[in-house]
Every structure is written in structure tokens, then in C-alpha cells.
UniProtKB/Swiss-Prot annotation:
Cofactor: Zn(2+)
Keyword Transmembrane annotated: no
Protein name listed in UniProt: 7-cyano-7-deazaguanine synthase
Record-level Gene Ontology MF annotations: ATP binding; ligase activity, forming carbon-nitrogen bonds; zinc ion binding
Phylogenetic classification of the source organism: Archaea, Methanobacteriati, Methanobacteriota, Thermococci, Thermococcales
Keyword Ligase: yes
Family annotation (Pfam families): QueC
Keywords: ATP-binding, Ligase, Metal-binding, Nucleotide-binding, Zinc
Gene this chain is encoded by: queC
Top-rank EC class of the record's enzyme: ligase
Length: 240
């Protein structure tokens, strides 16, 4: 029986690692990128198109206007306003990290995205939803936790006609571990985008990261500490 997977692809290190991992594990892989009006949407779509061609994987981009509207109601800085700037030291402060997480929170995003992926897989006959949830982000984003995955899979038993489950291959890893996995998989991570406020692309197609948002700092710190290098292009090199 053919093993099928849908990779929820947001363009960053986590989903890029998941994509390369899934390509080795499954017979059929589909990338699913969801647009909801975020600041980095244009860059995310181009990154998704790049990896779709690079790995010869089918890409589906879904637009969810209602999620943009709900995010605007909530006042999420990911769809408007200024994204918080943080330092590596501030990321170690749970209160400060939680404050930043609240600023960029998209209402029930992961639940909504997984529902979309589950619907697609149910229509195709079932399969696995591959998500980039990891131990580091689970400390500030509860919808990245192992418990969340377990509860989702309990619900999916009742929600789909065909068997669908969530698989989180990075669930025990921090950014350093993810960096090491990317290197093992020979992933072209420099073409991925983690930035909440990207500045466009280089001539060879690499996203230009702001270097100041939480996601940029986590990315740079993880790569340097994990594999001793960072090929990412930054407008301002993050201070770690």
C-alpha cells in the first residue's frame, strides 16, 4: 500500500527539515502551504515553489481569508503592525518569550491548518500529516507540544472517513538538533525562510532575513550552535 504524506510547509527550518525527511520516508509527498495574509506570505510562497521544484514534490497553496480577518481582529503582529525585536538573552526569559509569542499568535492556526491537511488527506484516501512541532517552540507555543499531537490524533479518529494521523518527527528536538538533521539530510536550508519580516531575496534566490525578530534569532542561534555555520542571508546579523 502506498504511503502518503502531506507536509505542512511554512517555509522555515522546521518544515524544510520535515519535507526532506518525508521525501525519504513516504512514497507520495504533497506540500501544503496556507496563506492567511501574514507579512512573509509572498516570500513563503516563493520558498515553497523553490523546494517543490528542488525535491520534485507536488505543491498545493490554499488561501484562508477568514484566518487573516480573525488575526486582524486579535491584533496579531504577523498580519500587521510591528513584529517584536528580541535578543538571544531575552529568549531565555520565559516571560519575555511568552510575550513575544502572544504578539505573533494567529488564532488557532495550527488547529486550522491541520484540519485543512486532514481534509485533503481524507479526500485522497488517508495518510499522515507531517508537522514541524519541536521541543524548543513548545515552551512558548502550546500547540507545538506532544500533548497537542496526541489529542489531535484522538480527534482525527472520529473526524475523517479514511485513516489520517499527525506525525511530528522533530518533537524531541530543539533548533540545534533540527540544524543537525538538516545537515544530515543535505538540505539547502539557506533557501528557506524563518523571518517574520523578510526583506526580499538575493539574486540567487535566498530569502533576506531581518535578523531582529524572534524567529531569526532562534534560527541563527540554532544553526551556529548545532552545526557551526549559518548560510542564511541577514539584513542584520542576529546577536547571540
Amino acid at each position: 500500500m502506498k504511503r502518503r504524506a502531506v507536509v505542512l510547509f511554512s517555509g522555515g527550518l522546521d518544515s524544510t527539515a520535515c519535507l526532506y525527511w518525508a521525501k525519504k520516508q513516504y512514497d507520495e509527498v504533497i506540500m501544503l502551504t496556507v496563506n492567511y495574509g501574514s507579512n512573509e506570505e509572498r516570500v513563503t510562497n516563493k520558498v515553497a515553489e523553490y523546494f517543490s521544484k528542488e525535491l520534485d514534490v507536488r505543491l498545493k497553496i490554499v488561501k484562508l481569508d477568514f484566518l487573516k480577518e480573525f488575526s486582524e481582529i486579535r491584533g496579531s503582529s504577523l498580519v500587521g503592525g510591528e513584529v517584536p525585536r528580541v535578543t538571544a538573552e531575552e529568549l531565555e526569559d520565559i516571560e519575555k518569550a511568552s510575550e513575544t509569542a502572544r504578539s505573533v499568535w494567529i488564532p488557532a492556526r495550527n488547529l486550522v491548518l491541520i484540519s485543512v491537511a486532514a481534509s485533503l488527506l481524507d479526500a485522497l484516501g488517508g495518510g499522515d500529516i507531517i508537522v514541524g512541532f519541536n521541543a524548543e517552540e513548545a515552551t512558548t507555543f502550546p500547540d507545538n507540544s506532544r500533548e497537542f499531537v496526541e489529542k489531535l490524533n484522538e480527534a482525527l479518529r472520529f473526524a475523517t472517513l479514511n485513516p489520517v494521523k499527525v506525525v511530528a518527527p522533530l518533537i524531541d528536538l530543539d533548533k540545534r538538533g533540527i540544524a543537525k538533521l538538516l545537515k544530515e539530510l543535505n538540505a539547502k536550508y539557506e533557501y528557506s525562510n524563518s523571518c517574520y519580516n523578510p526583506k526580499g531575496f538575493t539574486e540567487d534566490g535566498r530569502p533576506i532575513h531581518c535578523g531582529e525578530c524572534e524567529s531569526c534569532v532562534r534560527r541563527h542561534k540554532g544553526l551556529i550552535e548545532g552545526i557551526g555555520e549559518d548560510k542564511t542571508v541577514y539584513a542584520i546579523t542576529p546577536r547571540i
